[in-house]
């Protein structure tokens, strides 16, 4: 039977009342009772004897304290998570050469072998790009669109379908149809939607989500002069940006890593370009090629001191789920023409084609040695 509330209250108060009746403990109370009985007189003493109260046993002796020791007791701690050096806290992405930074979310393996060339410029336009193109997808090319036409020719010869545009709205809406997006010297705020009078950042969002799905990005030459005010894009370039360059001059390119994109490219070949100086300098990437700075005359272009110890010109990385293959080379028209008359044109075109194919996932990407 459940006791009443009053009974519960009484039970809860009982220990407190008992404690208040004998504040000095049971043992002292028993001794007092015996003393009072003794004071009451023999057979005729006054007052009845107090009831018997049991004497509480003496407390057991406490154990001796432990002997002093020099041993420092272990301090319990939370388990420490392993630090993942593939995560870049500055750009808030997983990036580098570890394939775990790749997300196979976009079903790009079943996507047709198709790439999109994006060559819109929002700043000084390189001569190799020619006259700006009309809006839309695959507008008519002009005879001076040398870089775009050269890329179409080179990649089509590999069985790759190539589309092209300088329309930022087309890029934002169609980007997921391609295994790789090629930024062909597209520069400055090339993804700013103010170019098409929109108020939303659709192109940037589309590129970021495309990379996170496992897309491929190829940046050529002045793609390093784009989106200076968007840190995500700087990270996509490998933590690098164009700062300045010296005269357009000859130098020797050296392949520094074995990779599917450098396969069968001579370990050293002559080339002519602007040899971009970079700020910041790329990090957490796989360097593929450099320029031998001893062959550059002059080396520097004030105020940048140049990269005398190591001047990279091509590299690759996984970035935020996708693949990024990058080169600062590609300034001159003769590097893209079919007659291969330019110094180093054969080697350069082979390097670019193989870089695009690796970014598409057609060959192994950015392999570690």
Predicted feature residues:
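Catalytic beta-strand/loop cores that center a nucleophilic Ser/Cys/Thr
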Residues: 88-101, 239-326
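Short, Lys/Arg-enriched N-terminal segments with co-localized hydrophobic residues
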Residues: 1-15
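A short acidic/glycine-rich loop-to-helix N-cap element
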Residues: 333-348
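A glycine-rich, often tryptophan-bearing local segment used as a flexible ligand/cofactor-contacting loop or short
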Residues: 187-267
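Structural recognition of the beta-strand scaffold that forms the well-ordered cores
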Residues: 114-119, 162-164, 179-185, 211, ...
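Bacterial N-terminal signal peptides that target proteins for export
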Residues: 15-28
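Aromatic-Pro/Gly-enriched surface loop or interdomain linker
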Residues: 68, 72-178, 356, 364
């Amino acid at each position: 039977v459940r006791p009443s509330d009053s009974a519960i209250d009484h039970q809860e108060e009982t220990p407190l009342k008992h404690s208040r009746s004998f504040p000095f403990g049971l043992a002292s109370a028993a001794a007092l009772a015996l003393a009072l009985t003794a004071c009451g007189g023999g057979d005729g003493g006054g007052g009845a004897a107090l009831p018997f109260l049991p004497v509480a046993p003496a407390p057991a002796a406490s154990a001796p304290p432990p002997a002093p020791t020099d041993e420092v007791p272990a301090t319990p701690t939370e388990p420490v998570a392993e630090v993942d050096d593939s995560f870049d806290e500055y750009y808030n992405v997983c990036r580098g050469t570890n394939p775990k930074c790749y997300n196979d979310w976009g079903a790009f393996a079943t996507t047709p072998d198709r790439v999109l060339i994006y060559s819109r410029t929002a700043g000084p336009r390189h001569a190799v790009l020619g006259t700006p193109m009309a809006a839309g997808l695959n507008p008519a090319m002009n005879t001076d669109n040398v870089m775009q036409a050269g890329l179409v020719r080179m990649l089509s010869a590999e069985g790759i379908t190539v589309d092209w545009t300088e329309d930022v709205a087309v890029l934002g809406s169609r980007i997921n149809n391609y295994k790789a997006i090629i930024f062909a010297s597209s520069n400055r705020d090339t993804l700013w939607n103010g170019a098409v009078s929109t108020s939303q950042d659709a192109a940037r969002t589309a590129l970021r989500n495309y990379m996170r799905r496992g897309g491929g990005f190829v940046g050529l030459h002045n793609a390093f002069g784009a989106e200076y005010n968007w840190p995500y894009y700087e990270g996509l370039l490998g933590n690098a940006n164009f700062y300045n360059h010296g005269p357009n001059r000859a130098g020797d390119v050296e392949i520094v890593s074995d990779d599917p994109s450098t396969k069968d490219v001579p370990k050293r070949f002559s080339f002519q370009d602007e040899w971009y100086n970079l700020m910041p300098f790329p990090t957490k990437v796989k360097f593929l090629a450099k320029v031998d700075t001893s062959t550059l005359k002059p080396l520097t272009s004030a105020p940048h001191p140049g990269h005398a110890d190591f001047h990279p010109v091509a590299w690759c990385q996984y970035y935020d789920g996708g693949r990024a293959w990058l080169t600062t080379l590609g300034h001159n028209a003769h590097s893209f023409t079919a007659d291969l008359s330019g110094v180093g044109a054969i080697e350069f075109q082979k390097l670019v084609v193989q870089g695009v194919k690796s970014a598409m996932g057609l060959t192994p990407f950015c392999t570690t040695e």
